Amino acid sequence: MTSVKGLGASLGVAIGSSFVYKNEIDFDKEAILTHVEASKQLIEKFSSQILDFRSKERNDEADILDAYILILQDPEIVAQLNQNLDFSVEEVYSIFTSTASVFESMEDVYFKQRAEDILSVGKHLVFNMQNIEREITLNENTILIAEDLTPADTSSMDLSKVNGIVLKDCLLYTSDAADDVVG
């Protein structure tokens, strides 16, 4: 049995089978769709997930996906993407990393935190370009292990099956948010 030590975000002990969620871009995998097609599909997907979240009273996550759509429609990002319809996945993602670095350099904590949202949108756009399905099927009583999680990551998961979350980087869940997800 493996034992893990860290900072607790929420009181209690969770027992269950582990699921390691990997959210890394494989830049060697070719794009199937252009970034324009992938962006349209991603907006449709996020819009559908927003309606689903609202019906399940997961309004905070729905609001974040609303913001993700605004990022995809941001005039500066769209202008950079429209410079070349044949951008590679690296070139598309670099637009999001350079935009995120601008936000990370800002003094305001709110804007610094938006850098993670921008990177998340960039990753999901690349996944869409590569036609990588991000649907995750979890077993009952799962302990979810990840480097980090964003609302776009958890949007396709049945969180009622999650007993606990172990994160390397606590970007998404504070104690209250973790309690909401895990119950």
PLM region spans:
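Non-catalytic, soluble scaffold/interaction modules
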Residues: M1-S175, G183
